């Protein structure tokens, strides 16, 4: 996802879709906005032909490069969470600094981020921790932004969290 569109193309696509940049990567929402904007921008409906072509080309470019996260709809017993009470975050002040002993989803994703030692930089989608979310989208590390991250993580399949 990090090499599909340039930063300028990403910003232009999100502007054409009428979505904020922090929703980049939320493919169900982007698809819905794309279909709505295609109806509005279509030249037969009184829209601008060049703008419609730009929207379609950028969206198709993004769509062609992104691998589907949902390769299958089934699940197995190995994918079931072994933690009985999974919470998003236990305590903002403690967990925002990374508590090693905490078992909340926020800390588990942060630990997963720290454990992967690769030479390539982390990108949103490979690592879904809050730190990567704020870095990737250029957001501040605040409780309000955390709530938008939580909503996105809430609709992500557990097996795609990479923990």
From Swiss-Prot:
It comes from Squirrel monkey polyomavirus. Its main location: host cell. The common region of ST and LT proteins comprises the J domain. This domain is essential for multiple viral activities, including virion assembly, viral DNA replication, transformation and transcriptional activation. This domain is also required for cyclin A-transactivating activity of ST. A zinc finger (H1C3-type) spans 113-132. One of its GO terms (cellular component) is host cell cytoplasm. It comes from the Viruses. InterPro entries: DnaJ_domain, J_dom_sf, Papo_T_antigen, Papo_T_antigensf. Residues 12-76 form the J domain. It is found in: Host cytoplasm; Host nucleus. Keywords: Acetylation, Activator, Early protein, Host cytoplasm, Host nucleus, Host-virus interaction, Metal-binding, Oncogene, Phosphoprotein, Transcription, Transcription regulation, Zinc, Zinc-finger. One of its GO terms (molecular function) is zinc ion binding. The modification N-acetylmethionine is found at residue 1. A zinc finger (C4-type) spans 95-107. SMART domains: DnaJ. Promotes efficient viral genome replication by accelerating both G1 and S phase progression of the cell cycle. Inhibits host PP2A by binding to the A subunit, thereby displacing lower affinity regulatory B subunit. Inactivation of PP2A in turn results in the transactivation of cyclin A and cyclin D1 promoters. Late during the infection cycle, ST may induce dephosphorylation of host MTOR, leading to the inhibition of cap-dependent translation. May establish and maintain high levels of viral genomes during persistent infection in cell culture. Interacts with host PPP2R1A; the interaction inhibits PP2A activity. This is Small t antigen.
């Amino acid at each position: 996802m990090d090499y599909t569109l340039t930063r300028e193309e990403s910003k232009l696509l999100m502007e054409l879709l009428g979505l904020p940049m922090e929703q980049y990567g939320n493919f169900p929402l982007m698809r819905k906005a794309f279909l709505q904007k295609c109806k509005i921008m279509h030249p037969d409906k009184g829209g601008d032909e060049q703008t419609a072509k730009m929207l379609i080309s950028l969206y198709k470019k993004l769509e062609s490069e992104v691998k589907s996260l949902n390769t299958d709809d089934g699940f197995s017993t190995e994918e079931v969470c072994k933690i009985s009470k999974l919470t998003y975050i236990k305590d903002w002040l403690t967990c925002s600094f990374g508590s090693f002993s905490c078992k909340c989803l926020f800390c588990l994703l942060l630990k997963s981020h720290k454990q992967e030692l690769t030479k390539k930089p982390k990108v949103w989608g490979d690592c879904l921790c809050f730190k990567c979310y704020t870095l990737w989208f250029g957001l501040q590390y605040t409780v309000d932004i955390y709530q938008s991250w939580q909503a996105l993580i809430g609709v992500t399949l557990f097996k795609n969290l990479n923990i």
